Swiss-Prot record:
Pfam families: Ribosomal_L2 (PF00181), Ribosomal_L2_C (PF03947)
Gene Ontology BP, a term: cytoplasmic translation
Function: One of the primary rRNA binding proteins. Required for association of the 30S and 50S subunits to form the 70S ribosome, for tRNA binding and peptide bond formation. It has been suggested to have peptidyltransferase activity; this is somewhat controversial. Makes several contacts with the 16S rRNA in the 70S ribosome.
Entry protein name: Large ribosomal subunit protein uL2
Alphabetized NCBIfam families for the sequence: rplB_bact (TIGR01171)
Organism from which the protein derives: Mycolicibacterium vanbaalenii (strain DSM 7251 / JCM 13017 / BCRC 16820 / KCTC 9966 / NRRL B-24157 / PYR-1)
Gene that produces this protein: rplB
Length: 278
């Protein structure tokens, strides 16, 4: 993938860029693997906003991705197409299995149309193959990693993401996460070899607010420019700093949003670097 930059023909085009989609081999999805996707606008069943800054955006169809490939162990598949997925930053690969079934997976870096991929404990160590961590050599970069055996891929699924397998000791494997955190995971958990493709996506300059609205992202308004009725930082004459430590619209101090005593924390060997004092 490469980035195509626009000439500054308008203020919105100045500095903006877009993917050249050179890796994409088909412009429409597999019909049997598409489901309707209804926008919620960040609202719950009562109609109240529970997630801010969401709403609108272009209509999308959901592509069903296979995050549990254990039921295809020993069945080879051919990469029929590399496709664009509007629901994620990574591209997706359409697999045609020898038994006739078709499935989507996240497309790793270097996976080409016509390649053969497989899953299972005896699979080769090459991009796109899925196998348990116990069968992957230390130092290998992987993605789409399970947190629990059979639970489906949860970690490192976005464009350019990868996890490094540092080593194995007993029934646990040590992984270096994209955040820098080192975590222990059961060696029976599965992972896909290689890095997620489309890494240049992070370098796209969106150029104008309208492109964010196409993606379903609404504006983020600072509390200091609101009225006192809307935010604890609101009000004041002229430009003010808020007059207190940063808080949420409901008065809770910023940061420290994670559960302090999560059960799985005992599997974290080294925490991610946050730059904040704990």
């Amino acid at each position: 993938m490469a980035i195509r930059k626009y000439k500054p023909t308008t203020p919105g085009r100045r500095g903006s860029s877009v993917s050249d989609f050179a890796e994409i081999t088909r412009d429409h999805p597999e019909k049997s693997l598409v489901r309707p996707l209804h926008g919620r606008g960040g609202r719950n069943a009562h109609g109240r906003i529970t997630t801010r800054h969401k709403g609108g955006g272009h209509k999308r169809a959901y592509r069903v991705i296979d995050f549990r490939r254990h039921d295809k162990d020993g069945v080879n598949a051919k990469v029929a197409h590399i496709e664009y997925d509007p629901n994620r930053t990574a591209n997706i690969a359409l697999l045609h299995y020898l038994d006739g079934e078709k499935r989507y997976i996240i497309a790793p870096q270097g996976l080409k149309q016509g390649a053969i991929v497989e899953s299972g404990a005896n699979a080769d160590i090459k991009p796109g193959n899925n196998l348990p961590l116990r069968n992957i050599p230390a130092g290998t970069l992987v993605h789409a990693v399970e947190l629990r055996p059979g639970g489906g891929a949860k970690m490192a699924r976005s464009a350019g993401a990868s996890i490094q397998l540092l080593g194995k000791e007993g029934s646990y494997a040590s992984l270096r996460m994209p955040s820098g955190e080192i975590r222990r995971v059961d060696v029976r958990c599965r992972a896909t070899v290689g890095e997620v493709g489309n890494a240049e996506q992070a370098n796209i300059n969106w150029g104008k607010a309208g492109r964010m609205r196409w993606k379903g992202k609404r504006p983020t308004v600072r509390g200091v420019v609101m009225n006192p009725v809307d935010h604890p930082h609101g009000g004041g004459e002229g430009k003010t700093s808020g007059g207190r430590h940063p808080v949420s619209p409901w008065g809770k101090p910023e940061g420290r949003t994670r559960k302090p005593k999560k059960a799985s924390d005992k599997l974290i060997v080294r925490r991610r670097r946050t730059g904040k004092k704990r």
